[in-house]
Amino acid sequence: MIKIIDATLTMLEEYPLKKELVYEFARTLESLCIWGAVLTPRVYQLMEGDLPQGITWYMELPSPSESVKYPGIHLFFSSFCDGTGKYIRNIQVNDVSELRGLECTRPDNRLRLTGLDDLLIYESRDIYERGMKLLIQASPILYPENSCYCASAIAADYLQNHHNGTVMTTFTGIGNKAATEQVILAMRVVERYKPNNSFEKLADLRNIFEAMTNTQIPGHTPVVGRKIFYIESGLHVDGVLKKPSNYESFPPELVGASRKVILGKHSGGTSIRYKLKQYQMEDCYPVEHLLEMVKRLSIKKGGEVTDEEFLTMMSECDKYEKANQNS
């Protein structure tokens, strides 16, 4: 069974976290079929040991002897343990050649591998395939780093090739890691992961994350950005409206988003007709005239034309028509 463990909370040590938001974040992870979540001792103390049920709890704990202080935690990560019992040994891997050392690993040793950020950028495909084969044989929890901007791809490919594999990720990839939401959707699209489950709660997870960190996720962030389904280009709009699957690997509703046609300097007649249809006015206004007005305003303001501005243009067209009729 594929397992995804989210370690976002370990990356928020410097933020003024609130218990209610952390609890809500964990509950939302569980609703998204995330297998487990990782805490630090500080976050555990903030939660007062009151951990939501339904997911497996892990903790980053350098000293294994202190594990008795944290009831409710199922497993502990440490670089100073043998990987047996309740402990998972953390190993940093900086080069694919170091994976050969995993061949001597005993079956009862639990491992987590961090690093491997350059696994996908080798010129030889054979090197990558040998590395992936060694990973599958050892079956560690894979926690790739994102220095080469391919951690999410490495994590997803590991799960695609190893259907009993486990990866560790963070929301939006915070902390230079693979992004939880990207790995979930990659597995949904490629492997039909949880085919009967909706991931619309990802939008809720985004909102909770923003509240916890007092930040705003950029609009075009993959999977969870608010603007990833905003379309402007005339040809693009025409194609998406005719057959969305040609342009979108998953429907916006799957992740709690919605598609929106944006008016701007790259718009075409299809965009204008689409907007007019939204207002049930598709046969009432000259499309080419409105399109010219939209492009002029977009260039002038250096951005998109809002719905309010478009309605103003429609009113101006009405005034123009009345003036011509009276002249």
Question: Which residue stretches match the model-derived regions?
Answer:
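Hydrophobic alpha-helical scaffolding
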Residues: 15, 148, 173, 192-195, ...
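Terminal or standalone catalytic/regulatory effector modules within metabolic enzymes
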Residues: 6, 28-63, 252-327
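Active-site beta->alpha loop and helix N-cap motifs at the rims of alpha/beta catalytic domains
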Residues: 30, 36-122
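Catalytic alpha/beta core domains of metabolic enzymes, predominantly
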Residues: 119-246
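N-terminal small/glycine-rich loop or linker at the start of catalytic domains
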Residues: 1-18, 88-90, 130-139
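Short, acidic/polar
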Residues: 18-28, 95-104, 150-156
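Short, structured segments at the rim of ligand-binding sites
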Residues: 14, 18-21, 29-32, 40-41, ...
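Active-site pocket-lining/capping segments in soluble small-molecule metabolic enzymes
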Residues: 4-6, 55, 60-64, 68, ...
